[in-house]
Amino acid sequence: MVVQSMLSGTQPGGPERVPANNHFAAHTGPSYSIEQITSEDDLANLREDWNRLSETAESPNVFTTFDWFRAWNQRFTQEAPRRRRLSVLVLKKDGAIVGISPLINRTASRFAVVVRKLEFVGLADYNDFLLGNGPTGQIEAIMDFLVQTQDQWDLVDLRDLPKTGNTLAIVESALSYTGLIYRILPEEDRSPYLLIDAPWSGMVSRLSRSSRHTLRNQQYRLERMRGEGLRVRVIENPQEEPELLEKLIALEGQKRVNGKLVPPFIGRYPEVFQSLFDTLGPRGWIYVALMELGDRPLAWQLGFRCGKRLWDYTKAYDHAFSRFSPGTMLIPAVLDYGFSHGFEEYDFLRGEEPYKMIWNTGYHERFRLAIWSRRWISRARAFVYLDLKTAVYRLFGRSR
């Protein structure tokens, strides 16, 4: 189903009409109309325009691509079909698609209180709206749409929005006249990054003496193994590598944090990552760095190529070779690849683990945008989900 809207007015409770064809209609300014996509068939029809917007974005972001959204949404909907539905907002101007807000409507429960949330699909380090030219007007149109459809949701909870450019200022300005209540919070985890302005040999020379000593010793030990068949590859087309996904999953089964085995990530969602390999791989979004001893994988890193940036998404290594730090020592190979191919930044993504701190030259920050209406039921549910939930999580040492 497509719910179509032309927005008008900025006050909550403004005039709205539901025609017999189940299309919601209202009016908001002459520039933009909005369609709310709620079915898989209508979502599939967006592929071409969605890909166009994501590939021509000023800051390309794999987490805002059509195939990322669809693969994860299909999996999560299978797990909880009654609690999730599409709520993708498509912005049009003069009949052409100029922006997309990739949202889903999810029913969550906290302390026996049911909350209807609009949110991003999840498992992304950077979420965002897909906006073309005129982002100010497009964000204003999105916020107006939220006002006119506030009976469909209790809380808009947008996590991990990148704190770059003037997006935050535009959002606050757009919200200031809607009558909606909102809160902007910094996300706890920052994303360390490293500028790629030299090959690895040049970068390592800038590190502390102890870090240089450690990394060069590790590199020396690995170099000695080249005679035994050690090699490192950066695979640009993972979809063409036979049984690559199976190798990643097998090695991930040994992954440890603080010495303890951790639940698999890729192994939990093999069909999702196979879909991402098949769809995003041919379009140049994915790379896999692989360290092998003969035919035996020792370490891998799955990452993304987003414009001039490399994003380190997830990795694993053979615990039997942990003394060689094979996971960490994939980074020099990826940095050399990045430098030789014209990339300008290596982003470690979410988290400030010690090995990242050796390299990083700065941090990217993200923020959380929570919106609710002045209706008492929305206020009460937002309080339970945001304030009460946060207090309980802090009491028991949890986050997010």
Where does each model-flagged region fall?
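Intrinsically disordered, low-complexity, positively biased terminal segments
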Residues: V2-A20, L130-L185, S201-G202, E228, ...
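Active-site/acyl-donor-binding loops of N-acyltransferases
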Residues: V2-Y32, Q36-E40, N105, L168-R206, ...
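Short, flexible turn/loop "capping" segments at secondary-structure junctions
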Residues: H27-G29, E119-L123, Q150-D151, E223-G227
